[in-house]
């Protein structure tokens, strides 16, 4: 991919619990991240689709008001029900082709590719709009298990060879994100670093690192 003037952007991932005051926290994070936060992933586990949709609706409205893409994790069916901007697929969540058939041409479809060049190329060939590599660091959100840890060289290779954007994920903080930005990550997917403390301050700290790159 040729050098681009578009800087690295933030891709916020929700905590598993989005009840209570989370909509207000999301609002504050997006206000602090204008021009930097461009996508939000709705990621909940262990609840039925009806409850997930109920929890998603106010968050989706907040994202729309801030011109931030609302992406559903794992579930093509929920993304279709919500008319979400996109869906993020793990390796066991269906194919980009299936998602495209269900969600239409305009949907943003992302695929988890761990540390695999092969999976990323397959995803691109299948019509993915972005590929996600990780976990780069220890993370409560992305359990690496025995998975191979991706390298900075993987990001560099992808960004130089392919036009499809790449997302770096897994344990990313303002303190460790600079090498990922320099290696060519188009997006930093972040969760714990934002929601475990002051979301405004965290987003602003990421924005400062991006601006300094």
Curated annotation (Swiss-Prot):
Signal peptide: none annotated. Its EC number is 2.5.1.3. Binds 1 Mg(2+) ion per subunit. GO terms for molecular function: magnesium ion binding; thiamine-phosphate diphosphorylase activity. It catalyses: 2-[(2R,5Z)-2-carboxy-4-methylthiazol-5(2H)-ylidene]ethyl phosphate + 4-amino-2-methyl-5-(diphosphooxymethyl)pyrimidine + 2 H(+) = thiamine phosphate + CO2 + diphosphate; 2-(2-carboxy-4-methylthiazol-5-yl)ethyl phosphate + 4-amino-2-methyl-5-(diphosphooxymethyl)pyrimidine + 2 H(+) = thiamine phosphate + CO2 + diphosphate; 4-methyl-5-(2-phosphooxyethyl)-thiazole + 4-amino-2-methyl-5-(diphosphooxymethyl)pyrimidine + H(+) = thiamine phosphate + diphosphate. Pathway: Cofactor biosynthesis; thiamine diphosphate biosynthesis; thiamine phosphate from 4-amino-2-methyl-5-diphosphomethylpyrimidine and 4-methyl-5-(2-phosphoethyl)-thiazole: step 1/1. 4-amino-2-methyl-5-(diphosphooxymethyl)pyrimidine binds at residues 41-45, 73, 112, 142. Its cofactor is Mg(2+). InterPro entries: Aldolase_TIM, ThiamineP_synth_sf, ThiamineP_synth_TenI, TMP_synthase. 2-[(2R,5Z)-2-carboxy-4-methylthiazol-5(2H)-ylidene]ethyl phosphate binds at residues 139-141, 171. Pfam families: TMP-TENI. One of its GO terms (biological process) is thiamine biosynthetic process. CDD domains: TMP_TenI. Keywords: Magnesium, Metal-binding, Thiamine biosynthesis, Transferase. Mg(2+) binds at residues 74, 93. The keyword Transmembrane does not apply. The keyword Metal-binding applies. It is an enzyme of class 2 (transferase). GO terms for cellular component: cytoplasm. PANTHER family: THIAMINE-PHOSPHATE PYROPHOSPHORYLASE, THIAMINE-PHOSPHATE SYNTHASE. Condenses 4-methyl-5-(beta-hydroxyethyl)thiazole monophosphate (THZ-P) and 2-methyl-4-amino-5-hydroxymethyl pyrimidine pyrophosphate (HMP-PP) to form thiamine monophosphate (TMP). Belongs to the thiamine-phosphate synthase family. This is Thiamine-phosphate synthase. It comes from Erythrobacter litoralis (strain HTCC2594).
């Amino acid at each position: 991919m040729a050098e681009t003037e578009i800087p690295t952007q933030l891709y916020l991932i929700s905590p598993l619990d989005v009840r209570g005051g989370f909509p207000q926290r999301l609002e504050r994070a997006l206000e602090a991240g204008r021009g930097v936060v461009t996508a939000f992933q709705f990621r909940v586990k262990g609840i039925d689709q009806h409850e997930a949709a109920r929890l998603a609706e106010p968050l989706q409205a907040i994202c729309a008001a801030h011109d931030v893409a609302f992406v559903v994790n794992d579930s093509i069916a929920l993304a279709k029900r919500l008319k979400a901007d996109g869906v993020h697929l793990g390796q066991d969540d269906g194919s980009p082709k299936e998602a495209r058939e269900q969600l239409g041409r305009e949907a943003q479809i992302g695929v988890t590719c761990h540390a695999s060049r092969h999976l990323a190329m397959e995803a691109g060939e299948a019509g993915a709009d972005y590929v996600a590599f990780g976990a780069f660091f220890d993370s409560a959100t992305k359990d690496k298990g025995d998975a191979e840890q991706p390298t900075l060289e993987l990001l560099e290779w992808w960004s130089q060879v392919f036009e499809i954007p790449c997302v770096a994920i897994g344990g990313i903080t303002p303190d460790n994100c600079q090498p990922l930005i320099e290696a060519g990550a188009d997006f930093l997917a972040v969760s714990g670093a934002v929601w475990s403390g002051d979301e405004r301050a965290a987003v602003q700290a990421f924005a400062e690192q991006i601006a300094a790159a």
